[in-house]
């Protein structure tokens, strides 16, 4: 039988069984190691209302809270919502993560401080 991927589309290796999780989009049961995971950090307040709220606020130093969500997708939902895309046979072997998306107006982050 031909084999499409070295890891069979999973990160299981020596474990016999992995607990299933539910897809965020369609609620399909997917093994936790096979699910495509996406960690999203967003402002609770939408971009259009940030200025209004900061002007109306009493405290100048108040930082608006963020919303931290870990999304789990089944393979079909991840492809459909363009979280991942199918790649050529040679490109599948490339394990480097895709480049991080940075908005055009964002300032570059300072390098981490040495310890």
UniProtKB/Swiss-Prot annotation:
PROSITE patterns on file: RIBOSOMAL_S26E
Protein keywords: Cytoplasm, Endoplasmic reticulum, Phosphoprotein, Ribonucleoprotein, Ribosomal protein
Stored Pfam families: Ribosomal_S26e
Localization terms from the record: Cytoplasm, Cytosol; Cytoplasm; Rough endoplasmic reticulum
Single GO MF descriptor: structural constituent of ribosome
Record has Nucleotide-binding as a keyword: no
GO BP, sorted A to Z: cytoplasmic translation
Modified residues (Phosphoserine): 54
InterPro entries documented for this protein: Ribosomal_eS26, Ribosomal_eS26_CS, Ribosomal_eS26_sf
Keyword presence, rRNA-binding: no
Region (Disordered): 85-115
Annotated Gene Ontology cellular component terms: cytoplasmic side of rough endoplasmic reticulum membrane; cytosolic small ribosomal subunit; ribosome
Biased composition (Basic and acidic residues): 87-97
Entry function: Component of the small ribosomal subunit. The ribosome is a large ribonucleoprotein complex responsible for the synthesis of proteins in the cell.
Summary of subunit composition and partner proteins: Component of the 40S small ribosomal subunit.
Family, similarity comment: Belongs to the eukaryotic ribosomal protein eS26 family.
Annotated protein name in UniProt: Small ribosomal subunit protein eS26
Annotated source species: Ovis aries
Gene field: RPS26
